[in-house]
Amino acid sequence: MEEKVSTLTLRKFKKEGRKITALTAYDFPTAKILDNCGIDMILVGDSLGMVVLGYESTIPVTMEDMIHHTKAVSRAVNRAFIVADMPFMSYHISKEQAMTNAARLIAEGGAHAVKLEGGEEIASIVKAIVDAGIPVVGHLGLTPQSVHQLGGYKVQGKEKEQAKKIFNDAKVLEQAGICALVLESIPMELAKNITENISVPTIGIGAGPYCDGQILVTHDMLGITQGHRPKFVKQYADIEKIMIDGINAYIKEVQQVLFPDEEHSFTLEKRENK
């Protein structure tokens, strides 16, 4: 069996120029498939709020939601590095609150690292969690928990001052001890500049080809998600169509009494005549 992916593995991949692969999972069977395929990193994202719980944003997602889904994923995984999102307001009140919640995702959920959104304003919290022995992944650019403050799901860092802030935030988070950095919806030139100037791996989502790795929401790239698909998503399969075809075939066969047939039914044992 391949060696488990760790923070050291991720740094090694960056140093060697080997691209890191990452996708999301929120349940046991999906995580098992991803792990068996050899994905390097699995994110149990608070995106589960929109993808599987039906919320309009990530903001209503709770710590209990995150622990519940992280547990399911961690039971399935043998090799991949599991990162769990810290949900909205689970690390903003105090360092003590942040460390307690981060510890729960590791100890109860089975995650290997936690992910926090934000830059310089959360650097001291990141450092406190790292100093407690918990690996932290940073997240800059479009940060969904701040979607109302950002004015919607828009590309960040297009203007010079904004780009400078994102770059500086990346350096500050590196100093705070992050093990990796997610860059979301920023110009590829900015992502390239950050990637070349920090020692930790960058994982891009809508950040161009120059990051050390890439992540997408699994439901988006497999064609399960309904509604708007972001520009940066490439759809690799149409699982929704496969599901619809299968379900419609089942409905038809049940209604026409074609299922269950003899092959899928049980019969009484035939007794030998005495």
Swiss-Prot record:
How does it associate, per the subunit comment? Homodecamer; pentamer of dimers.
For this protein, the record's InterPro entries field holds: Pantoate_hydroxy_MeTrfase, Pyrv/PenolPyrv_kinase-like_dom, Pyrv_kinase-like_dom_sf
Q: Name one GO cellular component term.
A: cytoplasm
- Pathway linked to the protein: Cofactor biosynthesis; (R)-pantothenate biosynthesis; (R)-pantoate from 3-methyl-2-oxobutanoate: step 1/2
Q: How is the cofactor bound?
A: Binds 1 Mg(2+) ion per subunit.
Cofactor(s) required, per the database record: Mg(2+)
Q: Which gene encodes it?
A: panB
Q: What is this protein called?
A: 3-methyl-2-oxobutanoate hydroxymethyltransferase
What the record says about family reads: Belongs to the PanB family.
> Where would you say this protein principally sits, based on its record?
cytoplasm
From the UniProt record, list the reaction(s) this protein catalyses. 3-methyl-2-oxobutanoate + (6R)-5,10-methylene-5,6,7,8-tetrahydrofolate + H2O = 2-dehydropantoate + (6S)-5,6,7,8-tetrahydrofolate
* UniProt keywords, alphabetically: Cytoplasm, Magnesium, Metal-binding, Pantothenate biosynthesis, Transferase
